[in-house]
A protein has these predicted regions:
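Acidic/proline-rich low-complexity IDRs
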Residues: 1-5, 23-26
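Substrate-binding/charge-relay-adjacent region of secreted/lumenal peptidase catalytic domains
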Residues: 23-128, 134, 139-412
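A shared catalytic/ligand-binding motif for oxyanion handling
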Residues: 414-416
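Boundary of Sec targeting at the N-terminus
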Residues: 19-21
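Cleavable N-terminal signal peptides of Sec/SRP-targeted secreted and luminal proteins
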Residues: 3-17
């Protein structure tokens, strides 16, 4: 298969360092014991957030303390080096254990855990490299620890359903944790607002018959795996056991195995289903897809990634909240898939600096391990999807995570059939 090894494709400007140094910290003017960390004033302009209300102080909430990492500048330089085809170190990736020994911060980790225990919080999980410490406690505890107030935000989905998220509008951290904590997740960041459905037009086309995809390079009106292989000069569609790959599945997206089998029969290839289903979003038939969900991107991504790399072990990895959270989970595996495909995104201005920073750091660590993250650049160009039908919202609005400098951002190819 075509093994993608380019890790750096786009550039972006953010107010804080992608590698972990936060230059915006200042003393919290409301407290002599805390340091201001982050806020999201943009929440007030999100049209999908329709209500904000207070919640009971004994309600238990889970947050993630992100521990400051060491030697991230050096690790970033290594990423550039091993990703450069002209470098003598090209392709000489590091193991997860080597990266952990280089970046982990045991002193900071111990300080955070001790503080949480003393505050009455319960540590429920730690990542393999101790960078992420998950803890739960009543809201009253977090409001004291983070010098903030939490609310229940209601988020309206595209289908009209309402999801609730417990978040604050800003937060600070205690002075004694200032040198040890990069940020705290599940505080201000919200799930990306999914784009509306792409604009489409129905065109009457005859349905291809079994094996027709393979019988000719093009079939008028259809972008098939043979078309892609021909256009990009791919010799064949055979992958290998070592070329592992994974598809990110959004929280409302399902993969339908019957559809995948039908698609593969059109290409006249042996049925090849994903080997691993993480979080249970693969169903046999479309009738099993829950109300309010669909099987659009999940089907499309899986059909075509297997269509150009048949036989490569494939994982369908669904995730319910943030893309940064998903990447944390991937990076916390001993043997992550070597190619990660993401066809989702949202307006970057609604991504907190901390979430962008964490995503970048995970992408750097995965890149040094030889993992390529391929992200669709979006359907609407520079103006982003909110300008559909509303020219007043035209402007330059980057799409995250395609805007991240440590992913391979992929646009569309216009093919005349």
């Amino acid at each position: 298969m075509l093994r993608l090894t380019l890790h750096i494709i786009a550039a972006c400007w953010i107010a804080t360092s992608c590698t972990g140094d936060n230059n915006l910290r200042r003393l919290d003017t409301t407290s002599s014991t805390h340091v201001y960390m982050d806020s999201m004033p943009e929440l007030k302009s999100r049209s999908d957030l329709i209500n904000k209300s207070t919640l009971h102080k004994e309600h238990v909430h889970e947050v993630i303390f992100v521990v400051q990492q060491q030697n991230m500048d050096e690790l970033t330089a290594i990423l550039h080096d091993v990703s450069d085809p002209e470098s003598p170190n090209y392709g000489q990736h590091m193991s997860g254990e080597q990266i952990t020994s280089m970046t982990m911060n045991p002193i900071a980790r111990e300080a955070v855990v001790n503080y949480l225990h003393a505050s009455g919080a319960i540590v429920t999980a730690e990542s393999l490299d101790n960078e992420f410490i998950t803890a739960k406690a009543p809201i009253r505890v977090w409001e004291k620890v983070l010098n903030t107030e939490f609310f229940t935000f209601q988020q309206e989905q595209i289908d009209g359903d309402i999801e609730e998220h417990i978040r604050a509008e800003e937060y600070s951290i205690p002075l004694e944790l200032y040198e040890h904590v990069d940020c705290v997740l599940n505080t201000i960041e919200m799930p990306i607002r999914l784009t509306t459905k792409p604009v489409s037009y129905e065109v009457a086309l005859p349905a291809p018959k079994k094996g027709r995809f393979a019988a000719q390079t093009t079939y008028r009106g259809y972008v098939t795996p043979p078309v892609i292989r021909s256009y990009y000069n791919l010799s064949d569609n055979h992958g290998s056991d070592s070329s592992t790959q994974a598809i990110f599945g959004g929280r409302f997206d399902y993969l339908v195995s019957n559809d995948l089998a039908k698609f593969q029969s059109l290409d006249d290839i042996e049925i090849d289903q994903p080997a691993i289903d993480i979080n249970g979003h693969i169903v046999t038939d479309i009738s099993e897809v829950p109300a309010g969900s669909d099987c659009g991107e999940g089907n499309l991504d899986t059909q075509y990634i297997i269509g150009v790399s048949h036989g490569s072990p494939t994982t369908y990895w669904s995730w319910q909240v943030s893309l940064a959270g998903w990447l944390i989970a991937v990076a916390d595996t001993i043997d992550p898939p070597l190619v990660l495909s993401i066809s989702y995104g949202g307006n970057e201005k609604f991504i907190s600096p901390a979430e962008f920073r964490v995503f970048s750091r995970m992408a750097i660590k995965l890149g040094v391990r030889g993992v390529t993250i391929v992200v669709a650049s979006g359907d609407d160009g520079a103006v982003n999807f909110e300008a559909r039908g509303n020219l007043g919202k035209c402007g330059y609005f980057p799409v995250f995570p395609a805007s991240n400098p440590y992913v391979l951002s992929v646009g569309a190819t216009s093919v005349s059939l």
